[in-house]
Amino acid sequence: MKLPHKFKISVGGCPNSCMKPALNDFGVEGHKVPVFNSDMCRGCAVCQIEKSCPSKAARVVDGKLKIDASVCKECGVCVGKCPFKAVSHESETVYRIYVGGTWGKNSRMGTALSRYVTEDEILPLIEKTMLWFKENAYAKERLGMAIDRVGADKLEAALFSDDLLARKDEILAKEVLQHP
């Protein structure tokens, strides 16, 4: 498939961002979403959840654990640390997808899709992103620039429908768009 510009993919297994998923055209970041059961919390003086949380999102306040969702990175480090099982995780690893990131002299933080996806959704999303890129970007235009020009909402709507895959042969047959 001839694309308008290079297309870099990054895959990281956790939110530490070692592979810089938000700074590549398509980035995958694994998450273990913790589930807090306040009924199981006994408000330990030395809370193992609070002690283990690398982002300091967990704090014991008035004898009960509180997890600040705006700070929590959903890394899953806290899962299994409480001897009373106050924190568990969703049954499977979920993934945050970033699209349109670049780094270097023209850096752009990738746009995070609005929802987590499962492992089975990743490969079709990569294919759909590449098809959208081919159909919407001008020659030598990076994916992030095309997203900024066309709109992240339009990209996301296309990625979560099957329209691009239904038109795959048509899109692949087209030449790369030239600047008007």
Describe these PLM feature segments.
Residues 2-34, 152-154, 159-160:
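A gly/ser-rich beta-alpha-beta helix-loop segment of oxidoreductase catalytic cores
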Residues 3-6, 24-80, 86-94, 106, ...:
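Ferredoxin-like iron-sulfur electron-transfer modules
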Residues 10, 49, 74, 78, ...:
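General structural feature for long, well-ordered alpha-helical segments within catalytic domains
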Residues 89-90, 102, 111-116, 143-158, ...:
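Accessory RNA-recognition modules of RNA-modification enzymes
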Residues 93, 102-138:
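A hydrophobic, small-residue-rich beta->alpha segment in the mid-to-C-terminal subdomain
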